[in-house]
């Protein structure tokens, strides 16, 4: 590549030089691949992805005492009316204000947040289909009570069309309208129907017994690094 340009074609020559320099830089510039998608929720947390949940927006305090606090009320000098919090029952029930400033999250929302329980297990795994997705679960801690290990550990999965409970036994999946690791039949049945007759519902016996369906459940797993 010549670095000199002379004569009437000097302008074209300079353009060619510039193009060659740009090409050289581009060809030698390091490639920065896009980051891979997270493989699970634990990796999302580690890589600082953020998600805004539904159905309500909340303000999270991630600083105080290790973080993870859901703020349900705030007062401050935000130049609002002096009687801003002097409201009726329905206002306090539904919540009001601006979560970036002064607010009350709402008694219904506070009830939903505070009326929760959890059961945490150190081990939760199942086998492959050849082994009927047998459950292996151990190491309970939490405040919901254990409604898994004593009855459902080491049990095969059953559905309405496949009874792996006990050969010749009544189909627990058909009887209690779900799919689960039944064992003649259950002390938990989180895939059951929203019913209130005995043991027919979305059941976690150690917390709500056999007559009350849980309104909301989630089963979550993450890899232990």
UniProtKB/Swiss-Prot annotation:
Residues 32-225 form the Fibrinogen C-terminal domain. GO terms for cellular component: extracellular space. Expressed by the venom gland. A motif (Cell attachment site) lies at residues 75-77. Disulfide bonds join 41-60, 172-185. The record marks 176, 186, 198-199, 210 as: Implicated in ligand binding. The keyword Disulfide bond applies. Ca(2+) binds at residues 164, 170. GO terms for molecular function: carbohydrate binding; metal ion binding. It is found in: Secreted. Lectin involved in innate immunity. This is Techylectin-like protein. It comes from Phoneutria nigriventer (Brazilian armed spider). The lineage of its organism: Eukaryota, Metazoa, Ecdysozoa, Arthropoda, Chelicerata.
